[in-house]
């Protein structure tokens, strides 16, 4: 694993030890719940309801694979009453401290690691982990809600978090139904989703779309010329109509695909920018999980030949 920048390993080790000690977290009247990513934060907020401060550590457009924690970030982790993270090495440079805390404390949860391993996809970059991008399947993401509720129940033993879990399930079931409806009309020959890195495998498996990417599950390594050439060959052979950039990943490699295909006489367009490892700007529709996924589903369907409404599921795009 790469060395930490901006904060020493000893500081992270100390943070892991302190995080694993629930007595150090001050149980305020309005507890603070700290989530690493926007997707995890949105899930926690939906289950928790009112009465909690839900904060997110990794900001808009920041790649969690490459996020470098600062001393201020560790301070926020220490002050939080509960910490929720994705797990399966999504938070690459924070993996050790978060895993240590989750193993020893009952107020730290890796939401994706709470799912049965047989439901998850393999991680070729890290054999000890699964593919971390579970939020790309709304039905799988909904299954992360009950483990969140169990952690919250330790903070508020008298509070019933069942309604939040059920509301989350219903909201994500509606999102899933929308995806199935608008993606189904995509012609078989066009059912290929080509993106910068391999964040959409769960999405592809759920909606029967072949997923191809220039990079692997992690964005830590640069795309190789060989990978780009292989993807250009695929575009030409399958006559793929569109490719997609990602909001948290540089678009150089994807634009190289477009130019490479053009040089081979195959026209391929940029189908749009998808939200993969980070949501949109806080306070906007795409700054929510539902809005992020609505945008992705609608954008993919429109570019590949589906039949989405002009402004998406909730008429807010």
Regions flagged by a language model, labelled:
Residues 4, 26-317:
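Extracytoplasmic metal-acquisition and chelation regions
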Residues 1-7, 11-22:
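N-terminal secretory signal peptides
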């Amino acid at each position: 694993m790469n060395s930490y920048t901006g904060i020493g390993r000893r500081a992270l080790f100390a943070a892991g030890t302190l995080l694993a000690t629930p007595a150090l977290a001050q149980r305020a009247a309005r507890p603070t719940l700290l989530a690493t990513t926007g997707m995890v934060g949105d899930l926690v907020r939906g289950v928790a309801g009112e009465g909690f401060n839900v904060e997110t550590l990794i900001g808009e457009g920041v790649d969690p694979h490459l996020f470098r924690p600062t001393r201020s970030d560790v301070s926020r982790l220490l002050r939080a009453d509960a910490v929720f993270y994705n797990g399966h090495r999504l938070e690459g440079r924070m993996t050790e401290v978060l895993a240590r805390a989750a193993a020893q404390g009952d107020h730290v949860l890796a939401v994706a690691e709470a799912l049965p391993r047989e439901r998850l996809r393999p991680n070729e970059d890290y054999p000890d982990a699964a593919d971390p991008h579970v939020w790309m399947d709304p039905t799988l993401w909904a299954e992360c809600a009950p483990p969140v509720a169990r952690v919250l129940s330790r903070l508020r033993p008298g509070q019933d978090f069942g309604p939040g879990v059920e509301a989350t399930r219903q909201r994500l079931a509606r999102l899933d139904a929308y995806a199935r409806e608008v993606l189904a009309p995509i012609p078989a020959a066009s059912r290929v989703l080509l993106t910068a890195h391999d964040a959409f495998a769960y999405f592809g498996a759920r909606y029967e779309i072949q997923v191809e990417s220039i990079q692997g599950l992690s964005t830590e390594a640069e795309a190789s010329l060989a990978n780009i050439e292989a993807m250009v060959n695929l575009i030409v052979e399958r006559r793929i109509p569109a490719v997609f950039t990602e909001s948290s990943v540089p678009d150089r490699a994807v634009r190289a695909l477009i130019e490479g295909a053009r040089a081979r006489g195959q026209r391929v367009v940029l189908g749009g920018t998808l939200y993969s490892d980070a949501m949109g700007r806080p306070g906007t529709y795409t700054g929510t999980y539902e809005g992020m996924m609505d945008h992705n589903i609608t954008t993919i369907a429109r570019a590949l030949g589906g039949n989405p409404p002009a402004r998406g599921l909730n008429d807010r795009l």
